[in-house]
Amino acid sequence: MLNKRPTIFFDLDGTLYKLRDGSYSQSPLKRYVLKNAVFYIATRLAVDKPFATKILDKILVKYREQISIGVEKELGLNRNDYFQFVWNIPARLVVRKEKNLRRNLLDLRKYYRLIIISDAPLVWVKNVLVALGVYDIFRNNIFSGEGNNRKGTKNAFPYIIKLLNLRPDRCISIGDQENTDIIPAKKLGLKTVFINQSQKSGHADFSVKSINEFTNLLLNIKL
């Protein structure tokens, strides 16, 4: 039997919070991740940091942001070990908390099932949600990037919808990346909301600038 309760899929980075210095590519978070990744490779392979840096550079060329997959396939290292080592970063160093976030989410939870869907590892997702003061809201509804069902490989939404027996037309996906948060979700029949402070989406059903605006928008979305 299909679960008819309306559901909201929240992306994490860039959606529930904004990174300091804007995008991931410009943020301290990326610098921490790359620094830790070099140290991880050097430690696990027993090589010096310059050589570890060369290894990482080759992985970045081939796998781009999917470093964990590259580390596993190219170096034979455990993906979860990589996540725990590299991504256990204090979120307070890079996260900008949005005003009234907790209140808005608690209001939404009265009517919707709230789910986090992120390709980031669970250790980072938990660190962020704790820093934002909303971990208890999502505690049992977190889908992170340790496994093979990821937004980046376009199979996360189908997997979760089947697992939870959801009706796609009773679901909303909100995120800041069209290629992973909007287009795949819309193809499955979900309502989609693009969040960006300065741009609108040509693919999403709606565009908003903040979670505050998204909360108000839901009054106009019929599921």
Model-found features: residue ranges?
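Asp-based, Mg2+/Mn2+-dependent phosphohydrolase catalytic module
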Residues: 1-8, 102, 106, 112-223
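N-terminal helical cap/lid subdomain that shapes the substrate entry/recognition surface
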Residues: 2-102
